[in-house]
């Protein structure tokens, strides 16, 4: 009897404007991993469909590297595995593709190494690898998650907000934007005055989200001073998308993660008209309605003869 581990891992959007490196939300676009033990002397990877066709098929694969680091940490040996990989999450577009792969690697190591890590421990590991929880926390738990990673203690604490009752539109450009390039666009420091200002905006946004006051939350999202002023020049479509969204009375339009995907929050009764307007305007981008994922990673184990 052969075991097959099936993982369904959601995409994520990070920051929501001023929640830089600390706020993220899971989305119903998925990375699918089907994992079985093989009879070879090494791991193998089979990539199916777009978004994963450029990835390596050998043990230089990111998922292999992370899984082995986890195995070494817990002093277990993993069997050689075959990983079949399909993905609806485009790479290097600000939708958490690397976080989804990282989380998948942790779940693979946990299962096939029989480590018995809890979700809390998986989150700690994931954040230690990533350096911040904004993508990995919602990927693991689902929903809208706030978190803080203490680099000194290596502990991540998270909190949850009710899923916003809004529609989400993502506009995905055809080009990639590497996170490291988007990081390099940011200033090294902020003045105390700017830090206080951005903290106040972020606090107000969170309070508004808790109260389901999406007009106020959106107003705060669009006043980010942490990253969007320094990254928007890397996304030529950003201001035009923002303008069209405003014409349709959207709550907010922000850069998703490090970009270049642009995320818009809007009332459900207005979302259809807006997404069609964006599709007409941007022939080189893909605009689509997505829903918020509330479950996080789902796992299923099947036994094959």
Curated annotation (Swiss-Prot):
One of its GO terms (biological process) is threonine biosynthetic process. It is found in: Cytoplasm. Pathway: Amino-acid biosynthesis; L-threonine biosynthesis; L-threonine from L-aspartate: step 4/5. It catalyses: L-homoserine + ATP = O-phospho-L-homoserine + ADP + H(+). Disulfide bonds: none annotated. Keywords: Amino-acid biosynthesis, ATP-binding, Cytoplasm, Kinase, Nucleotide-binding, Threonine biosynthesis, Transferase. PROSITE patterns: GHMP_KINASES_ATP (PS00627). Its EC number is 2.7.1.39. It holds the Pfam family GHMP_kinases_N. The keyword Calcium does not apply. It is an enzyme of class 2 (transferase). GO terms for cellular component: cytoplasm. ATP binds at residues 90-100. GO terms for molecular function: ATP binding; homoserine kinase activity. Belongs to the GHMP kinase family. Homoserine kinase subfamily. This is Homoserine kinase. It comes from Staphylococcus saprophyticus subsp. saprophyticus (strain ATCC 15305 / DSM 20229 / NCIMB 8711 / NCTC 7292 / S-41).
